[in-house]
Amino acid sequence: MAKFIKGDLIYNEKFDEYAIFLGASQWVGWIRVCLISTGEKSQVHDYIWELA
């Protein structure tokens, strides 16, 4: 997993999606993000995201 800092712009190539990193999730292997396309706050798998 990449080490993201709160506020980092991150990118998911598989889904062509950008998000703002909000922090770690309570679940192992997940992170909290705000999706740029919808503004939705969500928890997602961390391994498919990279720094934009």
Q: Where are these predicted regions, by residue range?
A:
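Basic/aromatic-rich interaction segments and small domains that mediate binding to polyanionic partners
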Residues: 9-52
